[in-house]
């Protein structure tokens, strides 16, 4: 991690298996409004910012700030586990770390608690299953993302989470299902 000279962005560098820089993600440090976020041109998305530990656990995040916030919230034995950022929701960096590190067989998807993050959780779980990884779990932040959880812990007003519209309807649909099933059973013999 370093600060770029021109705009004072935080730059998160991803290294390949030989320690060569292959990816850089910039995040603006300006605190008023939306900060700049983007990958440096020519970055290889397979080698995003990551940390590889000795345990079998891999935690997956949309962005480096989310990853660092999560680690700050879960400091106990953090160096033992592995972490990777997707710099969005693409699977390239996740699959690269799993291929490079065969000891990783427990995957925790820690994406943002918003519509895009929830949809990406489902998509990534499908990709993981297709690639033979079935020991997966979804960990959601209480607020919009792990950085917002960290802000809330320190008394700063967090951005709330956003549920997926289809998940909001789930309790309503679940409530009427038993009655619907009973009604269908009663009319089973109707042809």
Language-model segment annotations:
Residues 1-45, 49:
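Basic, glycine-enriched DNA-binding surface that flanks or lies within the catalytic cores of DNA
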Residues 7, 56, 106:
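Conserved catalytic motifs of the protein kinase core domain
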Residues 11-14, 59, 84:
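Cytosolic beta-strand hydrophobic patch enriched in CBS
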Residues 52-58:
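A short, charged/proline- and glycine-enriched loop
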Residues 62-63:
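Helix N-cap/beta->alpha junction signal
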Residues 66:
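Conserved Rossmann-like nucleotide-cofactor binding loop
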Residues 69:
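Phosphate-binding glycine-rich loops and their immediate beta-loop-alpha structural context
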Residues 72-191:
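TOPRIM fold recognition
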